Amino acid sequence: MAGQKYDWASAKAYSTVTAYYPEPDIIFLNEDLTYRKPAEAFNLYYYKDAHLIHFIGKKLDYFTKNKKGLKKQLTKLTLNLESDGDVISYHKIVNGELSSLDDSDLEEVLSHAEELYKLVGDKKE
């Protein structure tokens, strides 16, 4: 999710982003991530006045589990934010279990969302 620990614009991983916006501000970004390993992910970003206010991310990772095939890990993250980036509420679920939100995970989401917003904003003009 949100380019987690991947160089998302490199040969390791890349994303396709679709933006929806009335003039002048972007209100929604849909990002589909493709990894060079068995994994699937998508992120949804909702903006108000150029600030991220809601984020939904889902990622399905596949890991080799000895000789028994692949083990799956499903991670879902939902964030509700103030316009200054403070978290109002969150839900992080890993394989059906509630999990805590690390500061590093939050920083990755916020920095990636800001970077995407700038990239897409530059392209819309």
What do these predicted ranges mean?
Residues 1-36:
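N-terminal secretory signal peptides
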Residues 13-16, 28, 38-43, 57, ...:
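Short, surface-exposed coil-to-beta transition loops
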Residues 21-23, 35-65:
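Mature extracytoplasmic domains of secretory-pathway proteins
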Residues 27-31, 52-58, 87-92:
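Short hydrophobic/aromatic-rich beta-strand segments that constitute the beta-sheet cores
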